[in-house]
Amino acid sequence: MENVLFESFFEGKHIEVIEKNGIRSLQSDRKIVHSRIDLNDPEALISPYQQQMMLGMVLSLGAESVLHLGLGGGCMVSFIHKYFPLIHQVVTEKSQTVVALAREYFYLPESPSIQIILNDSTDTGPISYRSYDLIFLDLCDSEGPIPTFQIIPYLEKLKGLLMPGGWIVANSWKEGLALQGQLKEWQQLFAKVYYVEGLGESSVIFASQEQEVLLTVGYPEIAARMAKAIPLDFKTFLSALQSI
């Protein structure tokens, strides 16, 4: 049985918090799921694309600062806060309602290490006061991940926010030839671009400024070590990466 815990219309979207079979979801217009949690283990990441995106923590080992563009239910923010509590996280989200829903229904913690900036995520001005080791790009509207991060000028701004050795990890709904076209745009700006497709309706893009990234050297050991402390199969996620 499906229970509607919250329902509202704002910014032209029909926003709901739905609970069914022990899974709570934040969704818009009855077709886009922004976040999902298992009520028996609310701190676990259960969305395959978000699990894959967390490989960024392996690639950016030792990260001290993480930027999230888009909050949703805050599942990735909460996950990082639990397993990497010393990392400073900055989150941009334009809707105070979404922030409130993340706190009430998805248990987003309040912590000095989590800074939420109420602002349109496509505006990099308020977040440019510092650099970041890792940037998660997960922006979405009623049609899916928005095309903003296909625009070269926007990617250039984000690239300028990265620390040396930093990575950008992005959610994309493209696959096949459409995804390859998007990846070529990224390749214009980044020395290394990897991707994984077939994660439900999502693909994930990984981009680095570093010329020499050897995924077979060092990273498998890091992934195996991290998987002992964190309930994610990082070695499988690493082996799934494809280069363009």
Regions found by a protein language model. Name each.
Residues 86-88, 111-113, 165, 190-192, ...:
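A generic structural signal for alpha->beta connector loops
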Residues 1-21, 25, 33-40, 57, ...:
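SAM/dcSAM-binding transferase cores
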Residues 44-161:
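The AdoMet/dcAdoMet-binding core of the Class I SAM-like
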